[in-house]
Design a protein with these regions (language model features):
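The substrate-binding groove and active-site-proximal loops of carbohydrate-active enzymes
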Residues: 14-25, 47-64, 111-130, 152-159, ...
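Carbohydrate-binding surfaces of carbohydrate-active enzymes
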Residues: 201, 275-661
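Short, acidic/polar
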Residues: 23-38, 129-135, 251-263, 323-331
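Aromatic-lined substrate-binding rim segments of carbohydrate-active enzymes
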Residues: 30-38, 42-109, 137, 233-241, ...
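Short, well-ordered coil/turn segments that N-cap beta-strands
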Residues: 10-15, 40-42, 74-80, 142-147, ...
Length: 661
């Protein structure tokens, strides 16, 4: 695996961050060398936003300043993750190529003065990006400091310009083959939308009312493919001159412009940016959710936390500060779930510019600060964990995750505004995290045989192949929980006829949904098992399944709300409403118990997070984080790698890494 090349080069796990020496003078650079040694920094990301310096005018490159910094970092024992600067074109580029500026859905054109001011489909942009990637690789491909290539930064920008329209049409021709096929897929017989020439076809720009759902979904697919193509062009330009591994950073959690399963197959190292959006235990659960997603997109292989925050991060209308100890806790939370280190944005907090108040490893207050002391302590901790490099995480439970299903639930006109795919994903993961079980994410068409329990939350779009795969999983002995609004449409967003969900899945579940009945926003309904539910209900009938709980509400009184069906060697559960959190936790706990899924370290109190990493040679390590307010006794004393001492109680807020005997 290519990430092992990185950790071998570093001599252990990675620790460091995004480094922008061009923002500072020579005196600060000298301080940086010393402070990086103190913090045990061994990897610095360089060049992310440096296009204007690297190429001050079109076709003329100036790498002298970069030579000096890479040489200096190498002399200081710091390896480099060298970025292509293509996420932020310089002003000269947009003036020379105004057609490369992005255009919003409503037709508003943007200009330079910020970042991400480009259209991925603009030929001039793509040429310039390839050229600078090739120039960097030719110059630094075998530089002794170079450990990793970092293509671009956060592929999140969208565009609806004329270049995009032309590229979209090319993509649609390749996907559908003919206008007749496109018209059928998009259902253009409705609202008189039938296309009679390709020139009539546009991206889903702002229009009078709802966008065509098939058009919107295909645009999401197209844009993901376009971003992947842009990444591959730079990656291939680099590989022509360098054999070092290549990555690009996936933006977590809410950005879903890319099919992250597809991107995971294209990079040598899966790397992610993660900034928890809530304090306390919610932030810890959020970190686990994104770390488990990253590992899953890496195919279960080790991956890398490329960016996180040491302290304040932007959260809506304010910056929120982390609590003491969070730098270590959040770093270890990602390492526990497969990351081969912890890096931050950025090394030194900017004194000017748009992200002046974004936290950094060295804050405005300097090294004599709580933040830098925590950074140094975290660097020391990470340095002690080198033996974990190359180890992996195993899970017996999976939550199904499909980018197409996510995009499908963003289309206009769904039956309820409360239907939200990422919320459903996070809720399922949170229940499993609270129960102390390690979780993978899996695609509905993946091989699911290694999982004892699989949860399918809100898979609105489900292909025939996916439905058949889930049917087979249950028949072969798996426990499957399917939640409401799953299997409703096919890959074209065509509604399933004859009852929901898709026919193969109905067979495994032993039910047939006839009607959706969204609830009013403040409405709560009771079920016969004493639980309550909100948001959604369905009229369904059993076709072999047993009713576990029924509705006690209106016309659905007595109708099944939660069912269980023995099918083949397994069991298919169906939940037709949104249970309250406590009842949902009970349901998930029952599934885990019946399937024999146990915690990694039984006997610990609630609030102690435990994940096990396994080495190919049979060694294993248990990483513990106590999110509770009281010390937690361990089931038996163990040796803690962080303190190099025996440990019998984990303090409140404390962390430990135990080497299994």
């Amino acid at each position: 695996m290519d990430i092992r090349r990185l950790t071998d080069r570093l001599g252990g796990l990675a620790f460091g961050g995004d480094y922008s020496p061009e923002q500072w003078d020579a005196e600060v650079w000298k301080q940086d060398d010393e402070l990086m040694r103190r913090a045990r920094v061994n990897l610095a990301t360089v060049g992310v936003f440096s296009w204007a310096l690297m190429e001050p005018e079109e076709g003329r490159y100036d790498f002298g300043w970069l030579d000096a910094h890479l040489d200096r970092l190498h002399a200081a024992g710091v390896a480099v993750d060298l970025a292509t600067p293509t996420a932020s074109p310089p002003p000269w580029f947009t003036l020379a190529h105004p057609d490369a500026l992005p255009v919003g859905r409503d037709g508003t054109g943007l200009t330079h003065g910020s970042r991400d001011t480009y259209c991925l489909t603009a030929p001039a942009y793509r040429r310039a990006a390839r050229r600078i990637a090739a120039a960097l690789a030719e110059r630094y491909g075998d530089h002794p400091a170079l450990a990793l290539w970092h293509v671009h930064n956060e592929y999140v920008t969208l565009c609806w310009c004329d270049h995009t329209a032309a590229a979209f049409r090319v993509w649609l021709r390749a996907r559908h083959g003919s206008l007749d096929a496109l018209n059928e897929a998009w259902g253009t017989a409705f609202w008189s939308q039938r296309y009679t020439s390709w020139e009539q076809v546009l991206p889903p720009r702002t229009s009078q009312w709802h966008r065509n759902p098939g058009q919107a979904l295909d645009y999401s697919r197209f844009w993901s493919d376009e971003a992947l193509a842009a990444y591959r062009e730079q990656r291939d330009a680099i590989r022509a001159h360098s054999d070092r591994p290549v990555t690009t950073n996936l933006m977590m959690p809410g950005y879903q412009n890319l099919d992250l399963w597809a991107l995971g197959r294209e990079v040598d190292v899966v790397s992610v940016n993660h900034y928890p959006d809530a304090p306390g235990v919610d932030a810890a659960a959020h970190a686990a959710y994104d770390a488990d997603r990253a590992r899953s997109f890496a195919g279960g292989a080790p991956w890398l936390l490329m960016e996180s925050g040491t302290n304040t991060v932007y959260a809506g209308d304010r910056t929120l500060a982390k609590e003491p100890g969070d730098v270590l806790r959040h770093s270890l939370a990602h390492i526990a779930r497969g990351s081969e280190g912890a890096l931050f944005f950025q090394w030194r907090q900017s004194r000017a510019g748009a992200e002046t108040w974004h936290s950094a490893m060295v804050p405005h207050a300097g090294p004599d600060s709580r933040t830098f002391r925590e950074v140094t302590a975290t660097g020391e901790a990470v340095a002690r964990l080198g033996e974990l490099a190359g180890s992996t995480v195993r899970a017996e439970v999976a939550v199904l995750h499909d980018s197409a299903a996510w995009w499908a639930m963003n289309v206009d006109g769904l039956p309820s505004s409360e239907l939200d795919y990422p919320t459903a994903l996070r809720r399922a993961h949170r229940a499993l995290w609270d129960a102390g079980r390690t979780v993978d994410f899996a695609h509905p068409e993946h091989d699911l045989s290694r999982y004892r329990v699989v949860i399918a939350p809100a898979l609105f779009l489900l292909t025939d192949a996916g439905a058949e795969n889930l049917r087979r999983y249950v028949a072969d002995g798996g426990t499957l929980l399917v939640q409401h609004f799953t299997g409703i449409v096919d890959e074209h967003l065509h509604a399933r006829l004859g009852g929901y969900p898709a026919a193969p899945l109905r067979e495994a579940l032993g039910i047939r949904v006839e009607e959706h009945r969204p609830l009013r926003q403040s409405e709560r309904i009771a079920l016969t098992d004493g639980s309550t539910a909100t948001s959604w209900s369905e009229s369904l009938r059993t076709e072999g399944a047993e009713t576990v709980a029924a509705y006690t509400h209106g016309m659905l009184t007595g109708s099944p709300a939660l069912t269980r069906h023995g099918f083949g060697s397994g069991h298919g559960w169906y939940l037709s409403t949104r249970l309250d959190d406590a009842a949902y936790a009970v349901l998930v706990g029952r599934l885990l118990t019946e399937a024999g899924v146990t915690p990694d370290l039984p006997g610990l109190p609630a609030g102690v997070e435990v994940v096990t990493r396994h080495a190919p040679d049979g060694r294993s390590w248990q990483l513990l984080i106590n999110h509770g307010s009281e010390a937690a006794p361990l089931p038996q004393p163990a040796h803690d790698l962080l303190t190099d001492a025996p440990l019998s109680r984990l303090p409140a807020g404390g962390c430990a890494v135990l080497r299994a005997l």
